[in-house]
Amino acid sequence: MKFISWNVNGLRAVVGKGFAEIFASLDADFFCLQETKMQAGQLDLAFDGYESYWNYADKKGYSGTAIFTKHTPLSVTYGLGIDEHDHEGRVITLEMPDFYLVTCYPPNSQDGLRRLDYRMTWEDDFRVYLQGLDAKKPVIVCGDLNVAHKEIDLKNPKTNRKNAGFTDEEREKMTTLLGAGFTDSFRFFYPDLTDAYSWWSYRFRAREKNAGWRIDYFLVSNRLADKMASATIHNEIFGSDHCPVELVLND
């Protein structure tokens, strides 16, 4: 069973850059998107054999998530059920017979770390939400988690220590989340692999130089780890400042 996650940084723009062909070539069972940056009715996008679920931000052209699936879920939940967090289209949960699939786009701490305090609250509430699901059945979490966990996960750790996405506070929240019973699928297979990134700034020819960050993840409940077949970063796929990431589970 194949899962794809991609921060498209504006779905309408990516549709004009070959999204349909990329979607078809990856042939995922579940294809999760973050930063769709659109409202209901702005794009008529459907694929044969797939159902789709969308969570839009109240603010136009901002955030937003979506999931395309070949498998009809038992239920669909939008957001965390906490009003403070549920106006930016950041979370969709599909309940499947044997697992939950959660795609998410946590809030960026922003320049000057002006949203760091809110990000800390969001992280704590999101972890509690995931633990509640995990108590019922295993969980697969994917998305642009807006944090590079370890120094190995970005090209220039020393110069980014106090920047959004690599603060000690954000990294510690990721450590806490993993400690709550989750496995980072990519590091499970490649614990020491360097220069493996999923996001590159549009500035300074960063992608050409592979001066990137690994901030797009698949996390799985620890008890699913032995069912993982592969984890892949598709850095050959363009169209966004992020590339898609993939998880394959044995059926």
Regions found by a protein language model. Name each.
Residues 1-9, 98-110, 142:
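Active-site-proximal beta-strand elements of phosphoester/diester hydrolases
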Residues 70, 94-97, 221-222, 247-251:
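Active-site beta-strand termini and strand-to-loop segments that position acidic
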Residues 1-47, 51, 57-63, 78, ...:
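N-terminal, active-site-proximal structural segment of metallo-dependent hydrolase catalytic domains
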Residues 37, 42-109:
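Structured beta-strand-rich core segments of catalytic domains in phosphoester-bond hydrolases
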Residues 81-82, 107-123, 158-163:
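Surface-exposed cleft-lining segments at the edges of enzyme active sites
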Residues 51, 125-211, 215:
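Metal-dependent phosphoesterases centered on the DNase I-like endonuclease/exonuclease/phosphatase
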Residues 7, 23-41, 101, 130-151, ...:
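Active-site beta-strand/loop signature of hydrolases that rely on acidic residues for catalysis
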Residues 60-75, 204-226:
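Conserved beta strand-loop-helix elements of the APE1-like EEP
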